């Protein structure tokens, strides 16, 4: 899915200019980062971040300087497959203002239980680790953007 690898300290992103892997700390998301090697500006994440552990989920949602939209999904879910390209559009269009992440509920059922996700897809918006809104069901990209924008 991604050339971005999240861990508990931040996002590992390869520089598009020289290939050097750089760490973008969650606390600094939304500001400008420069490559440690070539000093060129690094792009903001423009694709959904695939979260693979509770620890990384907690680090991203609690420390991100930007709001984090999390898509809870499953591989067997038809509506989840339909909304996946819409999530990619939102991530690309919202780069620098919103972090978009995905949680496969089959791989991380503990997170689905913890956040009482009973229908999928479910999108949950977090600000500084606090759930501020949620929406169940598939939506096109404009509907997702409207959902995010409706939260103060």
Regions found by a protein language model. Name each.
Residues 15-18, 35-38, 80:
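Short cysteine-rich clusters marking metal-coordination/redox-active sites
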Residues 19-22, 42, 84:
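Cys/His-rich microdomains that often coordinate metals
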Residues 24-34:
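Short linker/helix segments within small regulatory modules
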Residues 50-68:
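A short beta-strand-turn-helix
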Residues 51-52, 84-110:
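Thiol-based oxidoreductase modules, predominantly thioredoxin-like and allied folds used
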Residues 65-66, 72-76, 119:
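Short pre-active-site segment immediately N-terminal to redox-active cysteine/selenocysteine motifs
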Residues 72-86:
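Conserved redox-active cysteine motifs that mediate thiol-disulfide chemistry
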Residues 119, 124-152:
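Non-catalytic, surface beta->alpha helical segment in thiol-disulfide oxidoreductase systems
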């Amino acid at each position: 899915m991604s050339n971005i690898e999240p861990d508990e300290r931040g996002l590992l992103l390869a520089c598009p200019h020289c290939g050097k892997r750089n760490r973008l700390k969650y606390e600094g998301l939304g500001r400008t980062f420069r490559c440690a090697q070539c000093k060129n500006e690094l792009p903001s994440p423009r694709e959904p971040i695939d979260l693979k552990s509770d620890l990384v989920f907690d680090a991203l949602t609690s420390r991100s300087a930007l709001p984090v939209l999390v898509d809870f999904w499953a591989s067997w879910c038809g509506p989840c497959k339909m909304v996946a390209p819409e999530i990619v559009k939102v991530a690309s269009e919202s780069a620098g203002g919103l972090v978009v992440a995905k949680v496969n509920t089959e791989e991380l059922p503990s997170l689905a239980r913890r956040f009482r996700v009973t229908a999928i897809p479910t999108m949950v918006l977090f600000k500084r680790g606090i759930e501020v809104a949620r929406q169940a069901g598939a939506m096109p990209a404009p509907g997702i953007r409207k959902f995010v924008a409706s939260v103060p």
